[in-house]
C-alpha cells in the first residue's frame, strides 16, 4: 500500500493546523495505543483506512471545486482535470513552524535554492541529475530531510568522500575516471539518503512512521519520523538518534524538513 506524502504528514500531524483544516480533520485520525498489538502482528497495515478517508475527501472536494472555480471541464482531459483539482487542494503556502513565515509556494528546486541554512545540501543535490529532475517535477510528492550547513560541516569527511573512500583510492593510484565515478556515487548516495519519494512498505508503531529513502535497500526502512510533545523528530534507523525538526517548509511538490544533523555519517 502506498503511503503518500500527504497521508504521512496528516498521520503525524506535521502540517500546521491552519493547513490541516483545509485538507482533513486531524481529530478523525485515531492512532491510539490500543492498536499497538495489531500493528506488531500486522506491521504493514494502518490502524485506519487513510486512503479511504482521502478518497472520500477528494470526492467532496471535487464537487465543491467545480462550483467554486468554474473549471472548464470540457476543455481538459481527465488527467489534466485531476492535476488541476489536486493542485487546488494542496496547501497553498510555505510554513516555517519556528518563525511563522508564510510565503507563496514554489517547487522544491526553487525553494531549496533560496534556503541559505541548507545551501550546502542543495548544492550537492544539484549535482545529481535525477534528483534535480525530481525537484523540478511538479507531479512529485517528496519528503526532503535537509541537514543544515553546520551539520554537514561537522562531518568527519565531506559527503563526496564516503562511503567510497576517495583518499584511499587516490593513495592507491586509482584511475582518474574511477575516482570521478566514485565521487559522483558518493554524492548521489548522500543526497538520496535524505529523500523519500514514497513508501510502498512501511511500519507504523505508535506515533512513529518508518520510511524508505531513495538510497535504502532494507525491508523495514531507514528513516523514522515521529511526533512527541507537539514537536517533530527524525532519525536514521541505524541508530534511532532522533533530531528535532527545526523547520517544515511545504512546497508545491513536497516538503522540506530541516534538521541540525546528517542521517548518514562516515
Curated annotation (Swiss-Prot):
Primary subcellular site in the record, as a coarse category: other
Domain FAS1: 105-263
Matching PANTHER family: FAS1 DOMAIN-CONTAINING PROTEIN YDR262W
Gene Ontology CC terms: vacuole
Record localization: Vacuole
Protein name: FAS1 domain-containing protein KLLA0E16841g
Matching SUPFAM superfamilies: FAS1 domain
UniProt-listed Pfam families: Fasciclin (PF02469)
Annotated signal peptide: 1-20
Keywords: Signal, Vacuole
InterPro entries on file: FAS1_dom_sf, FAS1_domain, Mug57-like
Amino acid at each position: 500500500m502506498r503511503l503518500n506524502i500527504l497521508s504521512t504528514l496528516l498521520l503525524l500531524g506535521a502540517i500546521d493546523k491552519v493547513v490541516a483544516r483545509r485538507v482533513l480533520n486531524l481529530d478523525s485520525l485515531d492512532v491510539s495505543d490500543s492498536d499497538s498489538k495489531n500493528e506488531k502482528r500486522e506491521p504493514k497495515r494502518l490502524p485506519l483506512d487513510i486512503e479511504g478517508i482521502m478518497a472520500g475527501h477528494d470526492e467532496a472536494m471535487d464537487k465543491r471545486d467545480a462550483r467554486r472555480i468554474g473549471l472548464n471541464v470540457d476543455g481538459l482531459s481527465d488527467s489534466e482535470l485531476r492535476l488541476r483539482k489536486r493542485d487546488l487542494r494542496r496547501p497553498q503556502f510555505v510554513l516555517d513552524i519556528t518563525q511563522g513565515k508564510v510565503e507563496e509556494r514554489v517547487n522544491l528546486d526553487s525553494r531549496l535554492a533560496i534556503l541559505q541554512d541548507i545551501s550546502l545540501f542543495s548544492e550537492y543535490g544539484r549535482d545529481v541529475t535525477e534528483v534535480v529532475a525530481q525537484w523540478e517535477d511538479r507531479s512529485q510528492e517528496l519528503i526532503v530531510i535537509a541537514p543544515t550547513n553546520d551539520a554537514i560541516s561537522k562531518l568527519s569527511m565531506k559527503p563526496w568522500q564516503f562511503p567510497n573512500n576517495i583518499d584511499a583510492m587516490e593513495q592507491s593510484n586509482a584511475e582518474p575516471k574511477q575516482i570521478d565515478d566514485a565521487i559522483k556515487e558518493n554524492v548521489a548516495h548522500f543526497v538520496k539518503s535524505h529523500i523519500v519519494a514514497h513508501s510502498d512498505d512501511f511500519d507504523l508503531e505508535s506515533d512513529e512512521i518508518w520510511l524508505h529513502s531513495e538510497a535504502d535497500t532494507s525491508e523495514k526502512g531507514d528513516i523514522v519520523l515521529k511526533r512527541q510533545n507537539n514537536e517533530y523528530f527524525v532519525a536514521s534507523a541505524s541508530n534511532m538518534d532522533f533530531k528535532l525538526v527545526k523547520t517544515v517548509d511545504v512546497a508545491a511538490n513536497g516538503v522540506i524538513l530541516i534538521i541540525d544533523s546528517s542521517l548518514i555519517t562516515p
